[in-house]
């Protein structure tokens, strides 16, 4: 016999459908939405009403009991709702609200209500506070009638501890009363309602606003209109609260003429004229404390420190001994541990979905703005890129400069160039340490470039016409380009700065910064003898300060910057630095620190007045390999309008022979296309004579009697060794095939050299195969513009290598003598050069025809490629 189970339902009937057994109806979304919500909270019953609105009980609206515990409930909060319309027309009310919010954000004490967060939407501002489930302290006393002394002492000690913490933060409550005191679930006192909170200064803590509730406010607030001491007013309120706790009623309520206390004026007159009375059940010790606290004269009223030390509060002296700083540390420690512990989903206060720490309703959409009390915003510090040696000019913001996204209008720096530059900075520092050990006398060589510079090209986006570039020596690595500062490698060392102003030019990508390790050992010899020291009167830029456009180049002063010096031997073999600002030149790009490779192992500083060792960096130097450029030395007299160029035919021959003989086959540099002598205008005897006179005049100004002898010997010796070196170079060139780099296709733009005169417009153009595609349509040549380019720097090293030791010593003495005699002198870039001074050294050269043959020979060889 089969048996059928008949299960009874909750309404008393029965059914055979087992799917309906013990199934409670599920709430739909529409039923869930019937609850009144504010942000992520469901609003419950009204806890109380205040000046600005109601206080509602709240809890998370997406609560679900996921744990096994039956009594796991979300944390309840008290939400103080304030209508925005009620405060929009009264700025005083709005000030009170935000005062309360800001005060609670800075207060963290167990006896002060905790601010959870602040929410607001289009209608309400909601201040979310912790819920004190014990209720109002006033009702608690009414229920108990009065408290026993032991319990009263415990609660009063908590009140004093909280008030002392508030005062330690520079705040005063000014509205302490029983109605503003709450109890938590453990019957601990909680201070709330900071609507009248205000700040005070330790020097002047007097306040003028009369606030507070009747019977709790100090007499000085009501009777007198003078400023009052706010902390003493809070002490009076605490005394009234203590009296109500012990007696069960308020003091001075026995006036027969004002039994209800409705007449405030009469009440305070009665307070000032009547001594305090106590019921019989209040013991003498608490009476003594009350008599000291409830004194009409605030100057005679006891302070908080004396209250904490009173005999009646000794049982809680350990609690009262906790300082405000210790409360802060304790709260911070608890916060750290609370964040580190894995919290249950609803074990703590619900979070707003708009808050950064939100957990409660991240998926919910609501029209509210969250002001989290725990979020204190601080401005982010300026970010500094430590991976770039030279940053962008100040017109570009730091976030754009550090952005990983490449923009079309920005200079693209290759990673290899940055790596080479960073590595070379370390090498330069190492070389300086090695050179410093040699204890040689430093030679002061600073070259200042001034004058007019004319550019025919459009300004690049990376360099503005007002950008100032300052070159520093490896003694102190401070390089400023526009407004960017490179941190110094050695802060204690002196600084030598070389200034030059960049003119608008077309920008192009930087070309091939090749760093050859084989050249490092050779250049160490040069670095040991090269020093630059700064003038004591020159102001050094601060290495840690950075402000866009704040640095300007000081005007030229011969007393401030040391004069560019040159001796007689250097005139025959010296090389000059260039700023060859032509289209698609590597220097036209954003300034960066270019690597100077010197392949020779010469150690004589006298061989070149602008000798630059390996590993040195400067934004004032061209960013192309210096072996692939050439030029002539320009001698400029400060007061003269004519610039004389010292042209050395022997040096030119040697330079070209070195360039085309394949010496640089191990360096990835560009082939140089150089104009031949046939394209130069012929020299007249008058021009040669004028050039010779200008050289003789320069010799007279630059040397003293002792220096002239040594310079003549150096000149003769240099010419002898130059001739020997030319012969060796020619023999080597005839036996060696033409070597070139694949980068020679870019040689027309990246290493175009020599001095351009007004005859350059008639010059034959280079072959099209040597031209580089132009990136800018604004490229236009101007035949009236002239460029002074740097000569090959290794030539001076080669000459000085062959000089005997006595000659080098004499030249060094000559250089020091000239240093004391020389006056204003500098090397400049000019827009026009006097034709009469071109090739003035050709008349002195006995090998003029040989130079032409050599030049023609290598010219033909280069055209075969």
Swiss-Prot record:
Domain (Protein kinase): residue spans on this chain: 41-313
EC number: 2.7.11.1
Gene3D superfamilies hit by this protein: Transferase(Phosphotransferase) domain 1
Catalytic residues (positions): 175 (proton acceptor)
Phosphoserine carried by residues: 441
Compartments it resides in: Cytoplasm
Function: Putative serine/threonine-protein kinase that may be involved in rRNA transcription and ribosome biogenesis.
Protein name: Fatty acyl-CoA synthetase and RNA processing-associated kinase 1
Recorded name of the encoding gene: FRK1
């Amino acid at each position: 016999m089969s048996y059928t189970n008949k299960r009874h339902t909750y309404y008393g009937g029965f059914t055979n459908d087992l799917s309906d057994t013990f199934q409670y109806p599920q709430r739909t979304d529409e039923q869930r939405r019937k609850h009144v919500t504010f942000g992520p909270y469901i609003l419950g019953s009204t806890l109380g009403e205040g000046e600005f609105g109601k206080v509602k009980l709240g809890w998370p609206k997406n609560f679900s009991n996921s744990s096994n515990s039956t009594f796991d409930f979300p944390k309840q909060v008290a939400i103080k709702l304030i209508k925005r319309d009620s405060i929009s027309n009264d700025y005083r009310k709005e000030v009170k609200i935000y005062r309360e919010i800001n005060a609670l954000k800075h207060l963290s004490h167990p006896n002060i209500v905790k601010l959870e967060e602040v929410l607001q939407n289009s209608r309400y501002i909601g201040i979310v506070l912790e819920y004190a489930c014990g209720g109002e302290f006033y009702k608690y006393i009414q229920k108990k009638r009065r408290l026993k002394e032991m319990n009263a002492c415990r609660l009063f000690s908590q009140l004093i501890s909280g008030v002392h913490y508030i005062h330690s933060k520079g705040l005063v409550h000014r509205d302490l009363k029983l109605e503003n005191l709450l109890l938590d679930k453990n019957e601990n006192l909680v201070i709330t309602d900071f609507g009248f909170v205000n700040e005070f200064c330790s020097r002047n803590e007097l306040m003028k606003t009369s606030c507070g509730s009747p019977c709790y406010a100090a007499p000085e607030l009501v009777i007198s209109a003078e400023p009052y001491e706010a902390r003493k007013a809070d002490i009076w309120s605490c005394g009234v609260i203590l009296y109500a706790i012990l007696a069960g009623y308020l003091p001075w309520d026995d006036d027969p003429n004002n039994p209800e206390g409705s007449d405030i004026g009469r009440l305070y007159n009665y307070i000032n004229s009547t001594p305090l009375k106590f019921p019989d059940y209040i013991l003498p010790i608490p009476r003594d404390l009350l008599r000291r606290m409830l004194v009409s004269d605030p100057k005679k009223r006891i302070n908080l420190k004396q209250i904490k030390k009173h005999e009646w509060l000794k049982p809680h002296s350990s609690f009262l001994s906790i300082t405000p700083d210790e409360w802060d540390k304790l709260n911070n420690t608890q916060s750290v541990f609370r964040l580190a512990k894995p919290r249950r989903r609803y074990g703590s206060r619900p979070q707003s979905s708009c808050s950064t720490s939100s957990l409660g309703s991240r998926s919910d959409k609501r029209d509210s703005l969250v002001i989290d009390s725990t979020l204190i915003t601080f401005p982010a510090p300026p970010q500094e890129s430590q991976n770039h040696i030279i940053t962008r000019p100040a017109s570009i913001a730091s976030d754009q400069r550090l952005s990983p996204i490449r923009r079309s209008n920005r200079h693209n720096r290759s990673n290899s160039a940055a790596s080479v530059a960073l590595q070379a900075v370390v090498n330069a520092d190492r070389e300086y340490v090695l050179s410093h050990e040699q204890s040689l006398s430093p030679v002061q060589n600073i070259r200042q470039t001034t004058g007019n510079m004319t550019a025919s090209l459009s300004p690049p986006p990376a360099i503005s016409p007002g950008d100032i570039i300052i070159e520093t020596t490896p003694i102190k690595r401070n390089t400023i380009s526009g407004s960017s500062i490179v941190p110094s490698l050695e802060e204690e060392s002196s600084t030598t700065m070389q200034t030059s102003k960049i003119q608008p030019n077309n920008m192009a990508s930087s070309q091939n910064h090749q760093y050859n390790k084989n050249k490092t050992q050779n250049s160490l010899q040069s670095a040991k003898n090269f020093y630059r020291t700064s003038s004591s009167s020159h102001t050094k830029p601060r290495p840690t300060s950075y402000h866009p456009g704040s640095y300007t180049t000081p005007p030229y002063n011969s007393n401030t910057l040391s004069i560019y010096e040159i001796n007689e031997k250097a005139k025959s073999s010296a090389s000059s630095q260039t700023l060859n600002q032509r289209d698609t030149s590597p220097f036209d790009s954003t300034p960066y620190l270019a690597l100077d490779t010197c392949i020779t192992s010469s150690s004589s500083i006298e061989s070149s007045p602008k000798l630059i060792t390996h590993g040195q960096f400067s934004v004032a130097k061209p960013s192309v390999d210096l072996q692939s450029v050439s030029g002539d030395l320009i001698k400029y007299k400060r007061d003269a309008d004519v610039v004389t160029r010292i042209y050395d035919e022997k040096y030119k021959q040697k330079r070209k022979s070195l360039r085309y003989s394949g010496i640089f086959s191990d360096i990835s540099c560009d082939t140089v296309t150089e104009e031949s002598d046939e394209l130069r205008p012929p020299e007249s005897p008058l021009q040669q004579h004028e050039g010779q006179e200008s050289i003789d005049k320069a010799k007279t100004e630059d040397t003293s009697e002792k220096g002239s002898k040594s310079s003549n010997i150096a000149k003769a010796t240099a010419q002898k060794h130059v001739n020997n070196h030319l012969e060796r170079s020619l023999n080597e060139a005839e036996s060696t095939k033409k070597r070139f780099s694949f980068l020679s296709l870019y040689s027309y733009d990246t290493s175009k050299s020599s001095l351009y005169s007004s005859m350059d417009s008639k010059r034959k153009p280079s072959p099209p195969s040597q031209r580089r595609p132009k990136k800018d349509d604004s490229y236009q040549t101007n035949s009236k513009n002239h460029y002074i380019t740097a000569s090959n720097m290794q030539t001076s090293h080669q000459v000085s290598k062959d000089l005997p030791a006595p000659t080098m010593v004499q030249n060094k003495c000559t250089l020091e003598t000239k240093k004391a005699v020389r006056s204003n002198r500098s090397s400049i870039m000019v827009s026009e050069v006097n034709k009469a001074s071109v090739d003035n050294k050709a008349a002195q050269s006995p090998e003029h025809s040989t130079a032409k043959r050599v030049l023609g020979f290598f010219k033909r060889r280069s055209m075969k490629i």
